[in-house]
C-alpha cells in the first residue's frame, strides 16, 4: 500500500457499526466521507469543510451515488462547528492537523462533540524527506501528547500507507 486507501482503512475499523453518527472534519470532496457513509448505512455522517467548492463537489458525488445519510457543514474547525456536545460516535481528521494553525483548538473541538467512549481517527503526514508537507508535518508523538491533554486515550496506531501515520483515540 502506498498512498491512503480510505475504504480499506474504514473497513478495518472493527468498532464501527452501521448505526453510528460520524463526522469527517476537513472532508474536502469526500475521499473519506463517501466510504464512511456507505459503511454507516443506517447512521449519519457530517462532512465539515472550510471550502464551499469542496462541499459542492462532494454534494455532486453524493447525488451521483445516491447517498442520503450525509449532512454538509461549511465551517472552520478552529472556530467551532455547529454540532452539539457529546453527539458523535466517530470522527475522522485526515490530513487536517498539518494544515491548521491551532492544533489544540481542533482537538478540543473534536473532544467536545465526541460521545463518551467515542473514537477519533487522526491520520496525518509522517515526517519524511521526500514527499508531503514536510515543513508543516506533525510528529506522531506530539499528536499523542496533545490529545492526552484533552483526555483522549490512544487505543491503536498503525501506518496508513507509506506516507501517513494513523492514531485511534477514545474519549
Predicted regions, residues:
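Conserved alpha-helix/loop element of class I SAM-dependent methyltransferases that forms part
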Residues: 2-20
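Class I SAM-dependent methyltransferase SAM/SAH-binding core
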Residues: 23, 29-79
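A short acidic, Gly/Pro-enriched loop at the edge of an enzyme's catalytic core
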Residues: 78-90
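A short His-aromatic
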Residues: 96-99
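A short glycine-rich, Lys/Arg-flanked "PGG" loop and its adjoining helix->strand segment in the class I
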Residues: 104-116
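Conserved beta-strand signature within the Rossmann-like core of class I S-adenosyl-L-methionine
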Residues: 117-124
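Short alpha-helix
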Residues: 136-150
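Core SAM-dependent methyltransferase catalytic element
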Residues: 156-171
Amino acid at each position: 500500500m502506498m498512498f491512503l486507501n480510505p475504504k480499506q482503512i474504514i473497513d478495518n475499523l472493527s468498532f464501527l457499526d452501521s448505526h453510528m453518527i460520524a463526522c469527517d472534519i476537513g472532508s474536502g470532496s469526500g475521499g473519506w466521507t463517501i466510504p464512511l457513509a456507505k459503511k454507516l448505512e443506517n447512521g449519519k455522517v457530517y462532512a465539515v469543510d472550510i471550502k464551499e467548492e469542496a462541499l459542492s463537489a462532494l454534494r455532486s458525488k453524493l447525488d451521483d451515488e445516491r447517498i442520503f445519510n450525509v449532512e454538509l457543514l461549511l465551517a472552520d474547525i478552529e472556530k467551532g462547528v455547529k454540532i452539539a456536545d457529546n453527539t458523535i460516535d466517530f470522527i475522522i481528521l485526515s490530513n487536517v492537523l498539518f494544515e491548521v494553525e491551532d492544533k489544540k483548538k481542533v482537538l478540543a473541538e473534536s473532544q467536545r462533540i465526541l460521545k463518551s467512549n467515542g473514537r477519533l481517527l487522526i491520520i496525518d503526514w509522517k515526517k519524511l524527506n521526500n514527499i508531503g508537507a514536510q515543513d508543516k508535518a506533525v510528529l506522531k508523538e506530539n499528536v499523542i501528547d496533545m490529545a492526552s491533554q484533552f483526555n483522549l486515550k490512544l487505543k491503536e496506531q498503525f501506518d496508513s500507507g507509506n506516507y501517513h501515520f494513523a492514531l485511534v483515540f477514545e474519549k
